Amino acid sequence: DWQLLNNSVFNHKGLIDIREYDKEQVIHPEDVIDLTKQVDSNGCLSWEAPSGNWTIIRMGHTSTGRKNCAAPDTGVGLECDKFSKQAIQLHFNKMMDLLYPLIKPYVHQIQIGLEIDSWEVGMQNWTSGFEDEFCERTGYDLIRYLPAMTGKIVGSKEITERFLWDIRRIQADLLADNYYGEFRSLCNQYGLVSYCEPYDRGPMEELQIGSRV
């Protein structure tokens, strides 16, 4: 199930393993063309396609739209981008602008901590600059394999599943480094103890995120 393999579905109840597929529908990586530079600022594509049959896939990303659920009405808002240090820094510092003046007199007298509770925000599988992080961490460019994110077979079933494994690996690493790890760093800056509940079904490796906090 490609939606499970690219982490676009949450709380998935079963696997659908399609063992048979038409080999004529396999996409060869060398046949994939990156048309990004042919798209203008209005999102219009200008491209003179070579002869033959082509499928154009337009890919982008946006907020997941998920809101925090364990909060009073005045504290409900969009969840931050869990793969971005800048996102958690913005949320954390905005909160501390209001909270820290109240707890500052007690920080060095008693133990005060902040906690990330269990994962209840659905799935996330992309962030701004993900393609660059992927290349840096894996050593290869993902562009020619991106159709696999839409359920296409690229190269072969084995190659496709290996690529999607790499996708999940980088997602987990970004979550551990840029969210949980950065949370601990921010807590340390304020003299606070960091805690987390490192579990539930999300784009993470539970022991990895627990070790970051």
Task: Give short role names for the model-derived ranges.
Residues 162-190, 202-213:
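Long, structured ligand/cofactor-binding scaffold of large enzymes
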Residues 108-112, 188-194, 213:
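Short, well-ordered coil/turn segments that N-cap beta-strands
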Residues 118-128, 195-213:
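Substrate-binding cleft/loops of secretory-pathway carbohydrate-active enzymes
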Residues 1-165, 173:
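Mature extracytoplasmic enzyme cores
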